[in-house]
Amino acid sequence: MDQSTGQTITLPLREYLIGAVAAEMPVSWPDEALKAQAVAAHSYALYRRDHSTEENGAWFTADPVRRQGCLTDAVLHSYWGTAYTANYARLSALVDAVQTQVLYYEDAPAGTSYFAMSNGRTEASEKVWGTALPYLVPVDSSTDTAADNYEYTLNLSAAQLQQLLAERLGIAAGLPFAAGAVVWHAGAHSLRLCG
C-alpha cells in the first residue's frame, strides 16, 4: 500500500525489485551488494504476502514519495534525472540476474527485513516485532557508526514536540514536559515523555 495515497498498488515483480533496491541503496554500490538487496527484497515481499494482516489486501506499505520501501518509475525519474536511463539499465540487469532467487527458512520465504543502519548492533526479532525468528538475531554492525548521518541532532521546543506527538501519535497536546535532553545511545525500548 502506498502510505502517501492510501492506495493499494500492484507492481510486476521486476518493477518492484528495481524500485525496492533503488529505495534502499545508492545505484553506485557494488553489483553483488545490489543483487543481495534484490534477493532480500524479493524474499521479504513473499514473507509479507504469507504473513500480512492488512485488511486492504496489501502485503506491506511503502512510501515512494519519501523514497521508502519501493520507488515508482515516476519517482525514479525525478530522483535520478538525466541519469535515469543508465541507472535503470544497470539495476534492471542486476535484478534480472537474481530475480528468481529467494531465501527460505524451513521451506517458506524468510522474513529478510532490512534497514539503512543500526546503532552498531542489530536487534533480535522478538524485541522489534514480538516474534522470535531464529535467523534474525543480534549481530555486530559496528561499521554503521562510520556512516553518513549516523549521528545527528534535532532540537525541538516543548511546543513543537507536543504538536508532533499530537499529529503523529494522537497523544494529547498540553501535557507537561520536564526540561532536559534526551540522548539516544542505543535502541530505546521505551521513553517516558510526561510525568
Where are these regions (language model features)?
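Conserved, single-site charged/polar hotspot
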Residues: 1-195
